[in-house]
Amino acid sequence: MPSVPSDEEFLTYNRGVIDEFRANHGVVTQPPFPVLLLTTTGARTGRRTTVPLGFAVDDDGRVYVVASKAGGPKHPAWFHNLRANESVTVELGAGSFEARAVVTTGEERDRLYRRVAGDDNAYAKNTDRVFPVIVLDGVPTPASGMHISQPQKTG
C-alpha cells in the first residue's frame, strides 16, 4: 500500500505544482497526469486557499475531482472548505472559472468514482472512509486529452 504523505509534505509538493502550473499556463511535469487548481474559501478563516488536483470528465462533459488525500484517514481541508462554501475558483489550462462545487451522492458518486479509480484503488486500501466525489459545475469541458480517463491520484 502507498504511504500517506504528511500535511507538510502535501503543502511543499502542492506549492511546487501550483507555481509550475501558473508559470506554464496549466502544464505541469509532475504529477504525471493533468491537473487543475481549485481555490476554496476557508470555513473558519475565510482565507482563500489553492490546491492542485487531478480531475476527470464524465460522459456529459462535467469536470469532477475526488477528495482522496492519498487515502489519508481524514478528508482534505479543501473538501471541508467547499462544504461550507460551494463557490470555488477553478484554474484549468490557461483559463480561470467561477464554479459551484456539488458533492455527489449514492449511485452518481459511485459511478463517477469507479470511472477514475477502477476496482482496485490503492488509496482506498489505506482507509475505511468513502472518498467524496465533487462535480465542479460551471467549468467548461476541457480539450480532448486534457483529462484523466484511467485511475488517478488526487489530493
Regions inferred by a protein language model and the residue ranges of each:
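A short, polar/charged loop/turn motif at coil->beta-strand junctions and beta-hairpin connectors
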Residues: T29-P32, V130
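Short, structured beta-strand-loop surface elements
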Residues: S68-P132, G138-V139
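C-terminal edge-of-domain segments
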Residues: P2, A122-G155
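Extreme N-terminal tail/first-helix region
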Residues: M1-Q30, A143, G155
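N-terminal short leaders/motifs
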Residues: M1-T12, T40-R47, S87-S96, P142
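Short beta-strand segments
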Residues: P32-S68
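Generic, well-ordered alpha-helical segments
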Residues: Y13, Q30, G46-R47, A70, ...
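Short helix-to-loop capping/linker segments positioned immediately adjacent to catalytic or ligand/cofactor-binding
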Residues: H25-G26, T45, N121-A124
